Amino acid sequence: MSIDLSKLLTERRNANSANIDTLSTVDMLTVINQEDQQVAQAITPYLPQIAEVVDKVAAALRAGGRLIYIGAGTSGRLGILDASECPPTFGTRPEQVVGIIAGGHKAILSAVENVEDNKAQGAMDLQNLNFSNRDVLVGLAASGRTPYVIGAMEYAHSQNAFVAIVSCNPHGEMAQLADVAITPVVGPEVVTGSTRLKAGTAQKLVLNMISTGAMIRIGKVYSNLMVDVEATNAKLIERQVSIVMEATDCDRATAQNALDACGRHCKTAIVMVLADLSAAEAQSLLAKNNGYIRKALSNT
């Protein structure tokens, strides 16, 4: 089957970079930088759609469901990147936010031929995850037409699940299939068809919003502090102390003692200090308020 790439916005030539191979290095980079500046602005009109996805994901996570990203190539890698950052940043379990890439683990590091064209495999990869209507699927493809992702979307719909997409082609087949389509138009790439550039940047910005927004909604952030951060290295151990100090305006010794007493759980330590409670009392209060610090403090 032939594909008319000229119809895809992401495959058109960019007049602003037509002579980029003749420019000095600084001028070449200036063109790239100027093109990149369009990306954030292209996302702005889609904030209502992104908000809808955030709220759907938050509701799914509260109910025991999952956020599943699926894509091929750069798009798939971006989903995996966002998913992999959720456990250390927000203390989620690895299975709560999952990234799937066409071609599996090998495709993370190198290109795997033809896998993005396998529609049946997209559905099969969701089946292998026991995907259900409790989960949210976010399909990722710059072109908006990747068969692998479309297969996954169709399977998700067959399970009556909520399906969103992040693409840079508002007229692609994926946009027609999605419950919510987030399709910022970033224009042709500096290097024709190289969607790891502006399209990839746009997808990354949107994924940042989806995961971060959902985590804020389910209580993983207090003020602007990542209060469920896990202490998996020296930097994060120090960050925990800093977070408790910032949240409670206490001294270092008080923050350290509270963290030591509660098994290094920032939320518990914060409630201990602010409400003058023991570790057990703070843990119980947080549990009664679904892990939301503000709700817990208002009910002391």
UniProtKB/Swiss-Prot annotation:
Protein name per Swiss-Prot or TrEMBL: N-acetylmuramic acid 6-phosphate etherase
Subunit structure: Homodimer.
GO biological process: 1,6-anhydro-N-acetyl-beta-muramic acid catabolic process; amino sugar catabolic process; N-acetylmuramic acid catabolic process; peptidoglycan turnover
Other facts: A lyase-type mechanism (elimination/hydration) is suggested for the cleavage of the lactyl ether bond of MurNAc 6-phosphate, with the formation of an alpha,beta-unsaturated aldehyde intermediate with (E)-stereochemistry, followed by the syn addition of water to give product.
Stated induction or repression of this protein's expression: Induced by MurNAc 6-phosphate that releases the repressor MurR from the DNA. Repressed by MurR in the absence of MurNAc 6-phosphate.
The organism of origin for this protein: Klebsiella aerogenes (Enterobacter aerogenes)
InterPro entries: Etherase_MurQ, Glucokinase_regulatory_CS, MURQ/GCKR, Reg_chr_condens, SIS_dom, SIS_dom_sf
Pathway the protein takes part in: Amino-sugar metabolism; 1,6-anhydro-N-acetylmuramate degradation; Amino-sugar metabolism; N-acetylmuramate degradation; Cell wall biogenesis; peptidoglycan recycling
Record key words, sorted: Carbohydrate metabolism, Lyase
Gene3D superfamilies found in the cross-reference section: 1.10.8.1080, Glucose-6-phosphate isomerase like protein, domain 1
